[in-house]
Swiss-Prot record:
PANTHER family: RIBONUCLEASE Y (PTHR12826), RNA-BINDING PROTEIN PNO1 (PTHR12826:SF13). CDD domains: KH-I_PNO1_rpt1 (cd22391), KH-I_PNO1_rpt2 (cd22392). It comes from Ixodes scapularis (Black-legged tick). The lineage of its organism: Eukaryota, Metazoa, Ecdysozoa, Arthropoda, Chelicerata. This is RNA-binding protein pno1. Its main location: nucleus. GO terms for biological process: ribosome biogenesis. Residues 158-207 form the KH domain.
Length: 234
């Protein structure tokens, strides 16, 4: 502490002694007194309707050429969606869409997505039994691509390319399906593949090589090698 004589001397010189203030103890006390819950964000509790999945709806557009197959196979589509997935399904005649909705009996969170993939696979041209695998198995996927994205073709060149993908009597397509354990649908210039991730990759590689002009014999050899490597890996 400065004495009175030193303070008077500093006052005469015109300078003021600055004392260092210690705020460490005060800051510690302020932090201890602070309420950690004061700045917490309070969220309202989730509604029971959202937990039960009410109100979720999916619409799948049905192309015109699939109206008759949908009508003929409606019972096969209706049964697994309602009995196994516990969903509500109907065909809206006005919008030409298949509407799938959850209800109180719906238990599985992914049931709505499985049913939507199942119906979409059927509308793309897959058989009901093949599309039903999307409901039973979780590791199956659906992939589509356009031949024009691989190689731009027009007119007769596009028709010959699609013919190479199918083969005589569908032999090439069936061979690729059997080797890669997938299902393939050729719809105009669109190609739809149903299977597991690795198998879809093998089938897509074979189809793209055919589009690019490789002979089927070389494509078969490459495809069998890739399929054997996938089999050894798993």
């Amino acid at each position: 502490m400065p004495t009175q004589d030193s303070a008077a001397k500093q006052a005469d010189d015109g300078f003021q002694l600055v004392q260092k203030k210690s705020r460490k103890r005060k800051m510690t006390m302020d932090m201890d007194d602070a309420d950690p819950k004061a700045g917490a964000v309070v969220y309202p509790p989730a509604k029971q309707e959202k937990l039960e999945g009410k109100g979720e709806l999916r619409r799948i557009a049905v192309p015109a050429h699939r109206y008759t197959p949908l009508k003929d196979n409606w019972l096969k589509i209706f049964t697994p969606v309602v009995e196994h997935l516990h969903l509500q399904i109907r065909f809206n005649l006005k919008s030409r869409c298949v509407e799938i909705r959850t209800c109180k009996e719906t238990e599985e969170p992914s049931a709505l997505q499985k049913a939507a993939d199942f119906v979409r696979a059927f509308t793309l041209g897959f058989e009901v039994d093949d599309a039903l695998a999307l409901v039973r198995l979780d590791e199956l996927f659906l992939e589509s691509f356009d031949v024009q994205d691989v190689k731009p073709l027009k007119g007769d060149h596009l028709a010959r390319c699609i013919g190479r993908l199918a083969g005589k009597g569908g032999r090439t397509k069936f061979t690729i399906e059997n080797v890669t354990k997938t299902r393939i649908v050729l719809a105009d210039s669109k190609v739809h593949i149903l299977g597991s991730y690795q198998n879809i990759r093998a089938a897509r590689t074979a189809l793209c090589n055919l589009v690019l002009g490789k002979p089927p014999s070389k494509v078969y050899g490459t495809m069998r090698q890739l399929a054997s490597r996938i089999g050894e890996r798993f």
